[in-house]
Amino acid sequence: MDKDRIIALLNRDIEGEHAAIIQYLTHAYAMGEGEMACEIEAIAREEMRHLDWLAETIVELSGVPSLERGKMRMDGGSVADWMRNDVMLEEDGMNSYRQHIKLIDAPKIKRLLERILSDEESHHGDFEHFVEKAQKEGAKDIRGSRQDRITQILNRGIEHEYTVILQYLFHSYMTPKEEVKQEMQDQAINEMQHLGWLAEKIVDISGNPRIEHAEVDQSAKTADMLRADIKIEQEVAAAYDRAAKESTDTDLKQLLLRIRDHEVYHAEVFGDLLTEEEHQG
């Protein structure tokens, strides 16, 4: 099989992992705190690791990792229904990996897909167990229908965090600079924390987190990547600052200011890296 075809198959797998991450996080946040929600978040983190491995493999093949999200299964009126959807999503992934293992003849890539498939088979069993557990424990969707200025602010924050997670990961895959790569990955992890904090806060105040992203910068040059990342961090830090000043909820104000301070730090780190890059260039 030629390299371009392998890249296309791996990108299809990335899109499936991307869908699984967002579907599982949506379900976990909607259930609130609890053992099952924590276990589902842990599965989502394993899917993130799969996405990372696949993206790195694509770059090694001189390809570009896809930022598209595959099809999710988001219907269902109960937590047990959600878990059934998660079972089916894992079945979709397992079938895709098995097919690609047969098609791809590169030993290293085949071995990676077999490794990922092993995880998916385990996840499949976990979600089958969660169907029964959700029914037995009467697990509930604790999201509410609140829609006001506060939930709007929080959902805008989620949109930003999701966007920069994708952007920083993409830049980390595409830059040839190891220091920049490491910083991008570190800041992406921090942004993942922010997304979780914001989603949990919305659920706590009877709202509904909306996990969607805006346009992602896909610059090819490291300096351009850093300029785009500095720009978005400065813009969102200012937005969090305005929102914090507007809020009368002490806990929310503290959360927004904490995230603002992180975003300011990210912009400064990227600024240092840009200075180094421009001097070297």
Residue spans for each PLM region:
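Iron-associated oxidoreductase/ferritin-like identity signal
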Residues: 1-281
